[in-house]
């Protein structure tokens, strides 16, 4: 969750702090190395905001952003940690179709340009099919299928579970 009373920039900087080398002593004494590191955090955060198309909101409070921009900010903060794997749990929930399309483009861009693996948990099947190389389908806590989007789209167990159609035995 976002920190609603912090700015967009501050929210991303929070994600970046896990990569800092200076500890409590550095925060208190503020040697040149700590100040240099803090400047780098700010610069890195601006770079991330530009990639997420959020730079226009840099000084805006997170709570004042449109819902789709808040979702992008959550992803921006996660990306600030320099992850190898980005876990997205229903990132399209509550988004309108236009915002979902923008999210689709953003996740593809992150996957391809930032070379981050994306683990997506999502009910929007159009988004899942668009983004995924491999899909694991779970129904009531049990894996019922796995495969490529094409294989999943035509899988009788998936069709039955999600569309309610009968499987011919």
Task: Tell me the role of every PLM-derived stretch.
Residues 1-169:
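Glycine-rich phosphate-binding loops of nucleotide-dependent enzymes
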């Amino acid at each position: 969750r976002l920190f609603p009373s912090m700015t967009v920039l501050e929210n991303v900087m929070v994600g970046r702090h896990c990569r800092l080398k200076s500890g409590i002593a550095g925060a208190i004494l503020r040697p040149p190395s700590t100040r240099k590191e803090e400047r780098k955090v700010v610069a890195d955060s601006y770079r991330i905001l530009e990639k997420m198309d959020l730079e226009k909101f840099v000084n805006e409070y997170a709570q004042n952003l449109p819902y789709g921009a808040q979702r992008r900010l959550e992803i921006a903060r996660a990306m600030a940690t320099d992850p190898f794997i980005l876990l997205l749990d229903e990132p399209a929930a509550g988004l309108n179709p236009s915002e979902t399309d923008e999210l689709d483009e953003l996740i593809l861009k992150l996957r391809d340009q930032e070379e981050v693996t994306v683990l997506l948990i999502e009910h929007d099947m159009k988004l899942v099919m668009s983004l995924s190389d491999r899909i694991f389908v779970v129904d009531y806590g049990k894996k019922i299928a796995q495969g490529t989007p094409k294989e999943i789209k035509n899988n009788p167990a998936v069709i039955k579970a999600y569309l309610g159609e009968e499987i011919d035995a």
